[in-house]
């Protein structure tokens, strides 16, 4: 959920709300946060963080790691799309996820009503984990005009292809991910407010009742690598 933390920090900075960051006590966790780029995010928000400096491994970055970074266009999500293409992910799932990422790059300013979202990606234990997040208005606000009356309903509508816009090409990204996970495996979660919809090969399940509410939207996808 590194991308959602970055989006949260960015939104608080934009609102002029003071941010206090307490670095983890575990040295390995501090280095992991630095390697994933959280120090840069906190630096940009002018937050004192105490995270260590690390040297980037460019070869690793190109094939197995995308640091937390802001995006607001298709071009900005190119690094995340590239890591999907590099790994041995089932072609159908690869196409679906790449399409959803590109759609997110285009749509965050329109749908979320914020200038940018945040993304991150990493290969761990033969799985590729991707996260995109924004601290915008949330899925319910976006889809109220399309008939959504609850966060849970809005998330299900989004995963089944409903878009805020009437354009037939809109809203296909999340639906394609759901369909491809059903065929090729993996799992995904779309989170907004206090609600979550999870995607797995055999099930699409939505529920409300998160102990904390996230003001915005998070997409977290885990893809199997063959």
Where are these regions (language model features)?
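Amphipathic alpha-helical interaction surfaces in cytosolic regulatory modules
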Residues: 1-43
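Accessory, usually C-terminal, subdomains that scaffold auxiliary metal cofactors
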Residues: 139-141, 148, 160-166
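Helix-loop-beta hinge of the Bergerat
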Residues: 56-90, 146-161, 179
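ATP-lid-like helix-loop hinge signature
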Residues: 105-144, 200-208
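A contiguous, low-structure linker/loop signature
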Residues: 27, 31-68
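A short mid-domain helix/strand-loop element embedded in enzyme catalytic domains
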Residues: 69-102, 124-136
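Conserved ATP-binding N-box helix of the HATPase_c
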Residues: 6-8, 89-123, 174, 178-181
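Flexible, glycine-/charge-rich segments associated with ATP-binding catalytic modules
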Residues: 43-45, 49-54, 161-226
């Amino acid at each position: 959920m590194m991308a959602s933390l970055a989006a949260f920090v960015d939104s608080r900075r934009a609102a002029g709300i003071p941010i206090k960051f307490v670095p983890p006590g575990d040295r390995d966790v501090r280095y992991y946060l630095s390697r994933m780029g959280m120090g840069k995010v906190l630096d940009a928000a002018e937050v004192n963080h105490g995270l260590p400096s690390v040297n980037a491994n460019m070869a690793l970055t190109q094939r197995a790691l995308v640091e937390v970074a802001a995006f607001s266009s298709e071009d900005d999500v190119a690094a995340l799309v590239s890591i999907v293409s590099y790994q041995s992910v089932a072609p159908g799932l690869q196409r679906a996820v790449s399409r959803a990422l590109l759609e997110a790059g285009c749509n965050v300013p329109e749908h979320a009503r914020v200038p940018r979202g945040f993304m991150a990606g990493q290969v761990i234990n033969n799985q590729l984990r991707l996260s995109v997040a924004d601290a915008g208005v949330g899925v319910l606000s976006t889809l109220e005009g399309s008939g959504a009356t609850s966060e849970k309903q809005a998330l299900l509508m989004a995963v089944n292809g409903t878009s805020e816009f009437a354009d037939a090409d809109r809203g296909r990204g999340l639906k394609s991910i759901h369909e491809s996970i059903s065929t090729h495996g993996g799992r995904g979660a779309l989170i907004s407010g206090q609600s979550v919809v999870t995607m797995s090969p055999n099930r699409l399940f939505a529920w409300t009742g998160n102990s904390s509410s996230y003001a915005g939207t998070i997409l977290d996808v885990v893809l199997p690598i063959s």
